[in-house]
């Protein structure tokens, strides 16, 4: 099993090119099922979850062609299977996003209950309740969601009990081909949801309210393929910015989207970073200074993203002062904390809050990645820890970061992948 070996590194310096967003690419790939003609997606990152998504589409009978340079073409002409099996779904929660498209276009879908990162109960009931309101008959048995609808799904007025990115995306895709108008209230407003909506509009969907908490979708009878470019990955961008801040360096993230990262940029500025942005780049310069502690409370967009919480735990571990980080989105999302404590961090958990006393330095250790973003935080910690850090189980990292060791090496870090 691969691992990363990290030596204490100098301040990061240079340019890093940001990949396409995993959390936008996965639903957009699933949306290919809705299109009657060829659909080409570009700026798709080369990640394990993307590979799994392509396998899932092929398993359904779709023709998936990797055109190189981050481009994937999807043709559904021969799609004739409607079951997403356990062996694929268990490795990737986003597989649930095939449910809405299959049901909307073909009237039938069997999807295994999902797996993915083990960071608490992320229930699928919001997805199922919304589809039932649109006329689907759903039963869960033998570990599968079995959904059917006679004819087309029907437009409905859906109020989401809680903000859910995945459920918003699933219902948005289903509603695009439904009969009549669907209104989704308390919809997720994340940039990745906006990206999916813009993609569906390019395919011929009629959607208004994009970027707001109320989405209105006037269903159409058919959608066509299009060429669509996936947005930049804001979490990858944020991870590199935090790494630069922790190492007191100066880097520039290219092919980025500053507008999608306002809450993270604000916190980095609070920590003492000098940040400059252009239309598609962000520069962070710590001017050699140690970061200052910053309090964080995760929240749905436009609040502070839960996917950046672990990285800021590391920043605060090495910052001047004491900070609290409160996690409001997922329970059980502080699994990186015991590993950081093993590296010498002064942290204490109280319920869903982590209290962190900043110290001057960490010590290298053998640590274990438990989920995608936790693994990124351990790599960042290794960059500033005295001695050698080995991060095991980095298959988590490969689910969300493209060529992470190469990108860090390009910024001057000593990071090597080994068997």
UniProtKB/Swiss-Prot annotation:
InterPro entries: Enolpyruvate_Tfrase_dom (IPR001986), Enolpyruvate_Tfrase_sf (IPR036968), MurA_subfamily (IPR050068), RNA3'P_cycl/enolpyr_Trfase_a/b (IPR013792), UDP_GlcNAc_COvinyl_MurA (IPR005750). The modification 2-(S-cysteinyl)pyruvic acid O-phosphothioketal is found at residue 117. The active site is at 117 (proton donor). Keywords: Cell cycle, Cell division, Cell shape, Cell wall biogenesis/degradation, Cytoplasm, Peptidoglycan synthesis, Pyruvate, Transferase. NCBIfam families: murA (TIGR01072), PRK09369.1 (NF006873). Cell wall formation. Adds enolpyruvyl to UDP-N-acetylglucosamine. GO terms for biological process: cell division; cell wall organization; peptidoglycan biosynthetic process; regulation of cell shape; UDP-N-acetylgalactosamine biosynthetic process. The keyword Cell division applies. Pathway: Cell wall biogenesis; peptidoglycan biosynthesis. Phosphoenolpyruvate binds at residues 22-23. It catalyses: phosphoenolpyruvate + UDP-N-acetyl-alpha-D-glucosamine = UDP-N-acetyl-3-O-(1-carboxyvinyl)-alpha-D-glucosamine + phosphate. One of its GO terms (molecular function) is UDP-N-acetylglucosamine 1-carboxyvinyltransferase activity. Belongs to the EPSP synthase family. MurA subfamily. CDD domains: UdpNAET (cd01555). UDP-N-acetyl-alpha-D-glucosamine binds at residues 93, 307, 329. It is an enzyme of class 2 (transferase). Pfam families: EPSP_synthase. Its EC number is 2.5.1.7. It is found in: Cytoplasm. The lineage of its organism: Bacteria, Pseudomonadati, Pseudomonadota, Gammaproteobacteria, Alteromonadales. This is UDP-N-acetylglucosamine 1-carboxyvinyltransferase. GO terms for cellular component: cytoplasm. HAMAP family: MurA (MF_00111).
């Amino acid at each position: 099993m691969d691992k990363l070996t990290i030596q204490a590194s100098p301040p990061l310096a240079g340019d890093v090119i940001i990949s396409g967003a995993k959390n936008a690419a996965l639903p957009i790939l699933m949306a290919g099922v809705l299109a009657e003609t060829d659909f080409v997606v570009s700026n798709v990152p080369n990640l394990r979850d993307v590979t799994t998504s392509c396998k899932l589409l092929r398993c359904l009978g779709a023709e998936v062609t990797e055109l190189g340079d981050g481009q994937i073409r999807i043709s559904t002409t021969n799609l004739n299977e409607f079951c997403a099996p356990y062996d694929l779904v268990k490795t990737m929660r986003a597989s649930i996003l095939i449910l809405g498209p299959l049901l909307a276009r073909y009237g039938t879908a069997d999807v295994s209950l999902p797996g993915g990162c083990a960071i608490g109960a992320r229930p699928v009931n919001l997805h199922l309740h919304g589809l039932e309101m649109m006329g689907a008959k759903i039963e869960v048995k033998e570990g599968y969601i079995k959904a059917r609808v006679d004819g087309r799904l029907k437009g409905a007025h859906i109020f989401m009990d809680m903000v859910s990115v995945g459920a918003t995306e699933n219902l948005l895709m289903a509603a695009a081909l439904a009969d009549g108008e669907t209104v989704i209230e308390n919809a997720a407003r994340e940039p990745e949801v906006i990206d999916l909506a813009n993609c569906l509009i390019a395919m011929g969907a009629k959607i208004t309210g994009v970027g707001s908490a109320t989405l209105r979708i006037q269903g159409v009878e058919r959608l066509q393929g299009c060429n669509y470019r996936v947005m930049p990955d804001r979490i990858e961008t944020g991870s590199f910015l935090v790494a630069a801040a922790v190492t007191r360096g100066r880097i520039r993230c290219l092919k980025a989207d500053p507008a999608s990262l306002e809450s993270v940029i604000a916190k980095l500025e609070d920590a003492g970073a000098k940040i400059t942005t252009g239309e598609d780049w962000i520069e962070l310069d710590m001017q050699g200074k140690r970061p200052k502690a910053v309090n964080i409370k995760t929240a749905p967009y436009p609040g502070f993203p839960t996917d950046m919480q672990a990285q800021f735990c590391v920043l605060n571990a090495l910052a001047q002062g004491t900070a609290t980080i409160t996690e409001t989105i997922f329970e059980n999302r502080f699994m990186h904390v015991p590993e950081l404590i093993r590296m010498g961090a002064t942290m204490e958990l109280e319920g869903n809050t982590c209290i962190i006393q900043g110290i001057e330095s960490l010590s290298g250790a053998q640590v274990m990645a438990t989920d995608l973003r936790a693994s990124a935080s351990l790599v960042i910690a290794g960059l500033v820890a005295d001695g050698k850090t080995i991060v095991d189980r980095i298959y988590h990292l490969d689910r969300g970061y493209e060529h992470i060791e190469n990108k860090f090496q390009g910024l001057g870090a000593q990071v090597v992948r080994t068997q």
